[in-house]
């Protein structure tokens, strides 16, 4: 096989993954996407195979997440390059282990190290889990109802095993070796989980207490308008929304950073904004959840946190992208999965002394945002709400901590206008369906210029808005206190995978380092 053919084959693999990806994709193609890479690994023997793998994965990344370029060209190219490089390293390690050990151990290593790579993208500072294999089924929720037991890594495992079995069957065909047993195994692995899932989907009865909800989608352009609107302007907008639509006895949610002017934490409870909202709630018997920018000014260096920003001599500021809840008491939560390069500098202690403060400016203050260490559910006498802010909604195990803290509904507030009419905001809405299944919780979602809506605990859309539409959705959702297997045990598939990676890679190293006889 020459290099041009190898490049063509891995490019086809990358395009198969793109063609499978939601929301426009045909998901069964994901069961074929890895086969071209496995084929090249088997039949291409040149030393530049790393580059061949990289090109295929890069094609997948740039075509699947092209919408990132609408917000930042640099961020788009950086994310695609780093992610493709990591995928290539994983596949190259698989190649080395397979050659040194044997085919069976090699394939087990590929499955387990790929899962570990995906988990890394959920926890490290350059976090970018958008292309985790398990996300690919978000528009076909009838087939992955078992995510309540496995989370998205169950989907990743399914994709990897199926690709490997299909490749082995094809490889045996080329060699004239019968594959009857492998074919039966493949059919079982494809059909049995699908039947089980469809059965759950058809028989699942959603339980819970019915609640009233009004979801506001203001449709404000974040590039030109949002950060020039005062909190008082938005307060008047909020008041008019409630009174013109006669909203009473309801939970009302507004999107991320709806109040973007900034409110000092030590005065938020007593300031004019909070007092007026509480008066409105008292008058109309409502409760309000909204995005807000909170901050605190520090004058004592002993009180500094890792995300504190210096703004003068002996003065620092902590800024938070927060959610605030006005009920019979007032509560707040700080977004803690921050967007790399926009809300936080990765590995700040290392990079900031070298690069300085180089966060991208999309409005507001271009300073590192703060976070909190624990998830926190808002609780009142009427509601138990998990306040999930934007990017946090794509982290499965992370969200289970809200449920463990008493959250009975997943409330996502976001601002998805950065990417225009692309797959970006559509995929972000679609991925919320996975969280609904994993936790068996309803999702209520307020997006500023995105897609707002309600998703039930099977992952079905109950109601949703269009993009670029100023509107209010009024409806009902259900709160329940279900604790799923996945909520209880989290990403246990990753922990099992890590065990196998350590064992197999240690064995590989022992073979590599041992003296030849």
Where are these regions (language model features)?
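Flexible, glycine- and charge-enriched loops at secondary-structure boundaries
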Residues: 79, 83, 227-235, 422-425
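Short, conserved active-site loops that position catalytic residues or coordinate cofactors/metal ions
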Residues: 21-36, 60, 217-218, 249-264, ...
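Solvent-exposed soluble domains appended to multi-pass membrane proteins
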Residues: 255-517
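Alpha-helix C-terminal capping segments
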Residues: 40-41, 67-68, 93, 241-248, ...
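Membrane-embedded alpha-helical bundles of multi-pass enzymes
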Residues: 1-204, 421, 432-435, 447-449, ...
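Short, well-ordered coil/turn elements that cap or connect secondary structure elements
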Residues: 125, 208-210, 283, 438
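Generic structural signal for well-ordered alpha-helices
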Residues: 90, 94, 239-242, 277, ...
